[in-house]
Curated annotation (Swiss-Prot):
Name assigned to this protein: NAD(P)H dehydrogenase (quinone)
Originating organism: Photorhabdus laumondii subsp. laumondii (strain DSM 15139 / CIP 105565 / TT01) (Photorhabdus luminescens subsp. laumondii)
Lineage of source species: Bacteria, Pseudomonadati, Pseudomonadota, Gammaproteobacteria, Enterobacterales
Keyword presence, Flavoprotein: yes
SUPFAM superfamilies listed in its UniProt record: Flavoproteins
Binding site for substrate: W99
Binding site for FMN: S10, M11, Y12, G13, H14, I15, T79, R80, F81, H134
Amino acid sequence: MTKILVLYYSMYGHIEALASAVAEGAKKVADVEVTIKRVPETIPPEAFTKAGGKVDQSAPVASVQELVDYDAIIIGTPTRFGNMAGQMRNFLDQTGGLWAEGKLYGKVASVFTSTGVGGGQEMTITSTWTTLAHHGFIIVPIGYGIPEIGDISQMQGGTPYGASTIADGDGSRIPNENELKIARYQGEHVAKIAKKLKD
């Protein structure tokens, strides 16, 4: 059984929605077990609520040590100034012990994100790849494997690096169907590769 972790941070629910779609896609692949977890919140609860953060996220919180249990990890993070969110950064910064022992070496990884218009979706994904490369992950982009990536009939996310969604300033725009299709494709694509490598 190939084990896949969809690991995310979501403040307003955009990444949470993409994470569900990624997991849905991965579950299409036979003999694959998919788990969705989120990283711990670092913003004090009162401040998080005041900022409009989505408090009713059902995914359990992940621990750093459990990362070794998975064959593939698909990371979802919103953009913060062209980088991953601080909550994801804080979580990954705690993987030094795993790095020192090579515990994540050779595992599969992929990244998806949410940004504002011109917010750096590609930069966020590729800057997250840097951390993954230091661990020796096999990084899986999605290329142009799904036609929705090239759809210019509407404003949308989606890059050859990974799925994404465009979030407006007040968080009211939710992922559209094309963005969710791309996320499902990413999950399925990564699951197929992880399974092949494990077999």
